[in-house]
Amino acid sequence: MLITLEGLDGSGKTTVWEALHDVYPDATFTREPTDSWYGEAVDRSIAADDADPLAELFLLTADHADHLSGTIEPALADGDLVISDRYSDSRFAYQAATLAASDVDIDRPLEYIKGIHAAFSRPPDATIYLDLDAREAAERAGRTNKFEQDGYLAAVRKNYERLIDAEPDRFVRIDASQSPEAVIARVEEVLSELLGE
């Protein structure tokens, strides 16, 4: 089973992901961007305010393709539980906001990006969405890069809402404004239900 953790920067995904290592020690834990050379290129692009939005999208997509073939698919084939800190929904939400705010002439960026992935990507079995207001997310994240600004995160949050509306049965929304301990406890409950424990 592939479980993904999604939400705005600052929502606590990584904190939850790290806490789950103790609860599911035999699971395969992974994240996007990865630590491969593709992921390193993504990190460089994210840090650059002048990165071309289409080039950045395709760097992220290349990292995802490599992640699928090198980590996700082999782990699933072995029957592992896979828990990923970010996955394709991050790309849909974030890069659609980036493209919409750019000079790139794409009418429906979210649908465009989903279309690129449809040919090769594997959707998650379930997605835990850590929901947090854009302003609070930006404050928590520290506003250290172009993806951590209030206005941008508000657009990203709207894209996440569109994704949830399109597939409500796949997403489980958790209020991330609670304490980290409360969020972690709720995620553990949700995972237990999803895994039939």
UniProtKB/Swiss-Prot annotation:
Its EC number is 2.7.4.9. ATP binds at residues 7-14. It comes from the Archaea. GO terms for biological process: dTDP biosynthetic process; dTTP biosynthetic process; dUDP biosynthetic process. GO terms for cellular component: cytoplasm. Keywords: ATP-binding, Kinase, Nucleotide biosynthesis, Nucleotide-binding, Transferase. InterPro entries: P-loop_NTPase, Thymidylate_kin-like_dom, Thymidylate_kinase. It catalyses: dTMP + ATP = dTDP + ADP. SUPFAM superfamilies: P-loop containing nucleoside triphosphate hydrolases (SSF52540). GO terms for molecular function: ATP binding; dTMP kinase activity. It holds the Pfam family Thymidylate_kin. Disulfide bonds: none annotated. Gene3D superfamilies: P-loop containing nucleotide triphosphate hydrolases. Belongs to the thymidylate kinase family. This is Probable thymidylate kinase. It comes from Halorubrum lacusprofundi (strain ATCC 49239 / DSM 5036 / JCM 8891 / ACAM 34). The gene is tmk.
